A protein has these predicted regions:
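Metal-ion/cofactor- or nucleotide/acyl-coenzyme-handling active-site neighborhoods
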Residues: 2-314
Length: 314
């Protein structure tokens, strides 16, 4: 255990030094971007996690009333949607074209997001993933900028993951805190969002657009980019052969031919541990024992019925 803590400490120090030396000089904010004070932004006990699944377009008016009344956290290309969340988290894609699109959309939406807290993970990987970040990433324009360290959760099988989650929880890895500097992470940003919801003290987390049942996105509808003159959103190839070629060009290791009809986080070609099982494990081993309720917005999510739905589709 002591060795593991030393490793975490060493990684964080390298992360902290990178942020202070390379990121902090570009910021105009007066706060420390390595320490997030939750109370500065949190105004509700419910957190709506806003992902990009196509079911976002099926949410009923009651859901939007609740989302506007409570806190929300937008993920990655949520920027295409008109709703401005309390929190926003993104990571820079390994695909240069996708990274460039994210930067373009981010810059256009920054005036709308003036009061939103940005939680940026893997910020120390900008040199690798987006070399031109030094001149093109609008860091200085982000008023509430925070760089959070990602703590990797171990486990390559469901059983191993559940053991790791129980162990991490016992060691205080998911402890609630008024000031956050790091968040546990497993594969996808939605896990980080749930970790954040728990550690920031939310009592209820609602997953919106976490469909996992198909490869559709809400921003596939042209109205989202046309309304604000945004660039076309990135898409994955629709054929297995083209998708395989795309992944290979990015250095992604595949166990077999990928399936373009399903969400990439549940594709066994990419990882034998699907994202839905990761979410269920986190719910069972961490959220429920900590007294945090987890819901999906709509029953069309692959997570339903093991995780209950709050609304019916319009």
């Amino acid at each position: 255990m002591l060795l593991a803590l030393k490793k975490i400490g060493g990684r964080y120090r390298r992360f902290r030094d990178t942020v202070r030396q390379r990121i902090l000089p570009k910021l105009r904010c007066t706060h420390d971007p390595l320490k997030l004070r939750v109370a500065d932004f949190k105004k509700s006990d419910t957190l709506y996690v806003l992902a990009s699944g196509g079911s976002i377009n099926d949410l009923p008016p009651q859901a939007w009333d609740d989302i506007r009344r409570c806190d929300s956290l937008g993920i990655n290309f949520w920027l295409y949607h008109e709703h401005v969340p309390t929190w926003f988290s993104c990571e820079v894609s390994r695909t240069p074209a996708d990274a460039a699109t994210l930067m373009q959309v981010l810059e256009k939406r920054l005036p709308d997001y003036a009061n939103t807290a940005f939680l940026l993970k893997d910020i120390h990987k900008l040199d690798e993933r987006y070399p031109q970040w030094n001149s093109e990433f609008p860091l200085s324009q982000i008023r509430h900028f925070y760089a959070l360290h990602s703590l990797s959760v171990k486990g390559r099988t469901v059983a191993a993951l559940r053991r790791a989650l129980r162990w991490d929880r016992a060691l205080g890895g998911f402890k609630k805190s008024e000031e956050l500097w790091a968040l546990p992470m497993k594969r996808a940003t939605v896990f980080l969002a749930m970790s954040f919801g728990l550690m920031a003290g939310y009592k209820r987390i609602v997953l919106c657009g976490v469909d996992l049942s198909n490869s559709a996105y809400f921003y596939d509808h042209p109205r989202y980019r046309e309304a604000r003159g945004l660039p076309e959103a990135p898409t994955l190839p629709s054929s297995a052969e083209a998708l395989e070629q795309r992944y290979a060009s990015e250095g992604v290791k595949m166990l077999k031919m990928p399936d373009p009809t399903i969400h990439n986080t549940i594709d066994p070609a990419l990882n034998p541990l699907p994202m839905d099982e990761i979410i269920h494990a986190f719910h069972d081993e961490v959220l429920r024992p900590e007294g945090v309720e987890l819901f999906v917005a709509l029953p069309s999510s692959r997570l339903f019925p093991r995780i209950p739905a709050l609304y019916a589709a319009v």
